[in-house]
Amino acid sequence: MIAFSERARIIAVASGKGGAGKTNVSVNLAVAFARLGGRTMLVDCDMGLANAAILLGMPSAWTIGDLLAGRCGIEDLLQRGPGGLQFLPGHSGTGSGSTLSAAERARLMEALRPYAARFDHIVIDTGGGIEASSLALVAAADTPLIVLTPEPTSFVDAYAMVKALSVSHGTPSFEILANMAPHDVAARALFDKFRAIVTRFIDVDLAYAGAIPADPFVREAVLRKRCVVEAFPGAPAARAFAALARRMACPPPPLPEPILAEVGHGAH
């Protein structure tokens, strides 16, 4: 039986570039948490490409854009997804473009703050890249989870994100998830290489979160507008997401201030 916290553990899923599978990781991890029995919320904050709703097969009349514009409340926005997951759908493009402004970010976090005590996990699918809005969300989370793939561009861009978070926000530690790895040995080697290079130049701690294997069932699930954890629970990737959720389903370290009260004060 998983012991959950009295306050939500906030996990910000990020990558330095598009194409690393960040949204797939966010959705499947959140659903895996919910299937463990944890009270879980998934927040799609990728305002440029808000695709989590597609992977869940949950189109919405309302989005975060409507919440920020005052056209609806958060209760109007929340949708019940697989395993009892509560989903807050994102919006492709806000008034300020594809990223949240500091004011919009503050309004969103203020709306979410009362829910911190009602959930065990809040998974945030952040925007791709190293825009200030994405960095602030990642820096404020209990667990910054960086998605890394074997592609050289992913390696370079993940390095840039870790460096930006360390320099701009003083973020001291990260969990690194090897995604689309051909096998466990290659995934671990990818992490070891990344850690060796990062820690040579940046004073941060990197922990190996695990690996999600390259799996054709992931693509098949996307074509069905479902997440692989629900569509093909016996698939290698689905089993890996379930294992990742079990490893991460533990109480966060105690914090002096509620994390959601701090997110709005990140980089502008």
Q: Where would I find each of the regions flagged by the language model?
A:
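Inter-motif core of Ras-like GTPase G domains
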Residues: 114-117, 131-153
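Acidic-aromatic/histidine active-site loop/patch
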Residues: 1-10, 250-268
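Extreme N-terminal, non-catalytic leader segments
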Residues: 1-20, 24, 31-38, 72-76
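Gly/Ala-rich phosphate-binding loop of Rossmann-like dinucleotide-binding domains
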Residues: 34, 138, 166
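P-loop/Walker-type NTP enzyme "switch/lid" segment
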Residues: 42-117, 217-227
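Beta-strand-loop-alpha "switch" segments that mediate conformational coupling across diverse proteins
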Residues: 201-229, 241
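Conserved C-terminal guanine-recognition region of P-loop GTPase G domains, centered on the G4
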Residues: 155-170
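G-domain G4 guanine-recognition motif of GTPases
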Residues: 16, 149-150, 174-189, 211-218
